[in-house]
Amino acid sequence: MLTVNALIEWIGNEAQGESVIERILWLDEMSDLTYVIDVNANKLPYAKTISEYKVALDTEEAIMLDKDPFSRVVDEELLSEKAKAIRDRAWEAISSIVILEPEIYYPRERAKHVKTVAQKYGLSEKVIYKYLKRYWIRGKIVNALLPDYDRCGGRGKERNSKGIKRGRPRKHADIVGDGINVDEEIK
């Protein structure tokens, strides 16, 4: 049974990395049409037929994934104010157009709506498309727009400088010196 937000993995030659995972964004049983997005590619949604999925699932060319790699439980109280502000700003920008299904999946209609929203909120069209793709790929939920701060940096890891000074070179290095890297001896 196909549903919105279901993840379908097309089994290809996995040794060559040809496996594709698609998320179903919209279904219309009457016209045998669905819009999907490849979760591993930075591309926009495209149309496929529902019957194509049914045949692929029956012949095991594709499987329905039980676990969503993008789902994460988020405690609202543990989010920083900055992360909430980023999410809310992105949601405010795209909330009026993501509800326009299936129209938002038609390239010409989507372009018109994106242009309107970009002008209204003073953002570039590229940023609006980035928000839309992130929203669709991560499961059509508002928290999909949260920044990935938890995946940034190497908290607790020691940096290896190899003798080269890290950071921007000083403007007046000839007067104040080149600067140094902080290591265990200096700490």
Task: Describe each region flagged by the PLM.
Residues M1-K187:
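Secondary-structure boundary/capping micro-motif
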